Amino acid sequence: MLRRVFLSLALLAAAPLPALAQANAGQPAPAFTLTDLDGRKVALADLRGKFVVLEWTNPSCPFVQKHYGSGNMQSLQKRFTAEGVQWIVINSTAASHSEYLKPADQKAWLQKQGAAASVAALDADGSVGRTYGAKTTPHMYVIDPNGVLVYAGAIDDKRSANPADIKIANNYLLQAFGELRAGKPVSAPSTQAYGCTIKYGS
């Protein structure tokens, strides 16, 4: 009897733990409220009826620098916000990490880069990033006007930090929006994001 108990406990310990819930393309985008870099509340619910892009970032990451240093990210931000898309930049770096930036420093960096996002916010406790399953910087998400997540993954298909690769890359955001504007479903709703690991707190 005792042997069976120990065996059951061993099997239980070896069993994989249930994965944390993550946002999946084709499902409603998880609700969230963040505070932007100027101290104002930003709620996803308030953006219903509009396309929303979520961009996870970390200025210290070479992959983020690839897209900002080349002007690629700013170009995308300007293009989509001009079309009425709400673009939210989110930094989930933990406040205890050396790469954490205070709101004023994050704002100054974005201004220096000429960023054109609608909103920039910090997610220092990592709650929103974990809910969405954001793993890298950059990690991109597209939410449609009905609040459904229609794309989650990489910004493009060139998994390098080399800015020269941008010109030959297939940009998944441009592809997704091109299909959505044409009334078609997104052909690649999920891709594997690449970049630097998000520095979540413990």
Language model regions located:
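N-terminal export leaders
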Residues: 2-11
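Sec/Tat signal peptide C-region and signal peptidase I cleavage site
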Residues: 15-21
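Cleaved targeting-peptide boundary
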Residues: 21-29
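A short beta-strand-turn-helix
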Residues: 32-52
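Short active-site neighborhood of thiol/selenol oxidoreductases, capturing the structured segment around
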Residues: 45-65, 177
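Structural microenvironment flanking redox-active thiols in thiol-disulfide oxidoreductases
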Residues: 65-113, 124-131
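Short, internal strand/loop/helix patches
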Residues: 107-150
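Thiol-/selenol-based redox modules, centered on thioredoxin-like
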Residues: 142-202
